[in-house]
């Protein structure tokens, strides 16, 4: 089996190498092989695997659970002074995730065998696990756990995964890291550690004075709630990272009165609507029955100018009858609501990414993001536009009839 060894020497230099060994290979012989590759004397070498120190030289590597493709950490005794990895009674494990739990993708996650390349080192040698932890800054451990900002900085810069986590969860520290100034990075890091220490001291004071005090109980409850939220988010980021992305809305190509349009398919909308500007381009404003005007209320309010009782909409080769409620201000041209979808027995097939017209049997593909109208594209500065879309969606679900509006 192939074992990768991450070695930290006495002078803090690092080297990584791989060794081809058998599962029944004894630990003492493995140390000798590591000495040939790293120059670290076998008697000074400490081997760490899955946060556990391997001590019995007469045990085989297989008995420790090592398998093909695994990684171990080799630390030199004298300068490193390795302590047993994991939590100790007085000092919590280095964890900067804001939840008290391991960052997704580390060896203490729910599936440790899938994340075998993250380990704890000595307090002077922050491990990859600790570097992962820098990704939030919410839950900083004691400053003495990490007294080498230069080493932390170099480890983060050399690991793209850790750097991406840092950008997501601790933008301030990431900005200091990418500035290229070690002094700035050290200041931000130490400041966050100090803030964490002060928070821990405050919580300890509350616990020690009167743990049954109403204010203390409220603080404890809030602390537990925040930890549960962070843990839930961390699990979601590990198990379902796609849930943090945005999805493109469902649009199709269509034509009204010969004019090509991009229609938003919304099965949650009560009725099919069209913007005033689009109705003017399609030359159907002359058919608007203003007796059906009113105010639509939902997330916001919009004025309904009236209704076009009958028009034709072309989807692929099919010409379908449709009615439109005309809204005065709307970001999208046309929205196909439940009235039109039910009328033509349409079904949304997300597996095939098509809209199926039940009455004709034809289907049309939903548009990719690159072909969406500007108001629907997933751009960083479009929060307001997306909010407008949601407003329209809510607006058409709760129409309020005007004085002259008739009942459907």
UniProtKB/Swiss-Prot annotation:
PROSITE patterns per record: UBIQUITIN_2
Family recorded in the similarity comment: Belongs to the DDI1 family.
Entry keyword annotation includes Transferase: no
Key words, A-Z: Aspartyl protease, Hydrolase, Protease
Domain Ubiquitin-like: 1-81
Protein name per UniProt: Protein DDI1 homolog 1
Protein purpose: Probable aspartic protease. Seems to act as a proteasomal shuttle which links the proteasome and replication fork proteins like RTF2. Required, with DDI2, for cellular survival following replication stress. Together or redudantly with DDI2, removes RTF2 from stalled forks to allow cell cycle progression after replication stress and maintains genome integrity.
UniProt-listed InterPro entries: DDI1_N (IPR033882), Peptidase_aspartic_DDI1-type (IPR019103), Peptidase_aspartic_dom_sf (IPR021109), Ubiquitin-like_dom (IPR000626), Ubiquitin-like_domsf (IPR029071)
Residues at the catalytic site: 266
Disulphide-bridged cysteine pairs: none
Ranges of compositional bias, category Basic residues: 110-124, 398-408
CDD domains the record matches: RP_DDI, Ubl_Ddi1_like
Molecular function terms, GO-annotated: aspartic-type endopeptidase activity
Biased composition (Polar residues): 98-109
Catalytic activity, EC: 3.4.23.-
PANTHER family to which the protein is assigned, alphabetical: DNA DAMAGE INDUCIBLE 1 HOMOLOG 2, SODIUM-GLUCOSE COTRANSPORTER REGULATORY PROTEIN -RELATED
Top-level taxon in the UniProt lineage: Eukaryota
Stretch list, region Disordered: 82-135, 386-408
